[in-house]
């Protein structure tokens, strides 16, 4: 099947942090769209699975993640969004994850983060990177169209709810999430926005978020949500934690962060969460990829885009 060998070649290229051609990006996005459009707003995922937080274009650290966590398709992965922006390799990072999704659709689940948005990527780097590497905004346009198709959340074995940011005062049940029309740019407010922007906070009820979008939500809100939906815990990303992961509210909410030495200067470690078939948890902590394994982006990259 020529399609698969083409795809495998593209995956190999992307694994080496080499760009694929613009027309290949177009075809890849078209295939990805066909797969993603079938997924639910609350995508069902079966254990065993390894859950990952923000990556933010840190390609060599994503390779390190695969080194410590196992490769696709041997390991089943769930990535909770924020694939792009801030790091140097958003293009290669997102396209590799997308190519793996198309090649092994049942072994990798990608859900949307607040950075999977046209507006945010124009400010935090992905737009400029696409322009620099391809000489036009076409690839950015293909990718941002795919962002609109990404699922908003996932549920592992019916028990662990995974979302990029957190809860929303407009949402009490998973069924209410299922009714959202997700195929759009992330709105400035409302339930879809809240899922991607909110944060847990040591408070009760709802609070105003300093981020200017989403809400702060307290332990009582979580207890109510988890009981109403018969789930054990909420797993989310969205916030840098220096130790790679952090428990909140008596282990009912977990933050997982998977970008080590964030922005190449924060000095944090990263974590991924391995869940076995009984949902037993094991955290794998990892550090930034050693300096010698990363091509530090030169000031004037060679063959930066395809004419």
Curated annotation (Swiss-Prot):
GO terms for cellular component: centrosome; cytoplasm; nucleus. The modification Leucine methyl ester is found at residue 307. Transmembrane segments: none annotated. This is Serine/threonine-protein phosphatase 4 catalytic subunit B. Mn(2+) 2 binds at residues 82, 114, 164, 238. It catalyses: O-phospho-L-seryl-[protein] + H2O = L-seryl-[protein] + phosphate; O-phospho-L-threonyl-[protein] + H2O = L-threonyl-[protein] + phosphate. Pfam families: Metallophos. Its cofactor is Mn(2+). The active site is at residue 115. Binds 2 manganese ions per subunit. One of its GO terms (biological process) is double-strand break repair via homologous recombination. Keywords: Cytoplasm, Cytoskeleton, Hydrolase, Manganese, Metal-binding, Methylation, Protein phosphatase. The keyword Ion transport does not apply. It comes from the Eukaryota. Belongs to the PPP phosphatase family. PP-4 (PP-X) subfamily. PANTHER family: SERINE/THREONINE-PROTEIN PHOSPHATASE PP2A-RELATED. GO terms for molecular function: metal ion binding; protein serine/threonine phosphatase activity. Protein phosphatase that regulates many processes such as microtubule organization at centrosomes.
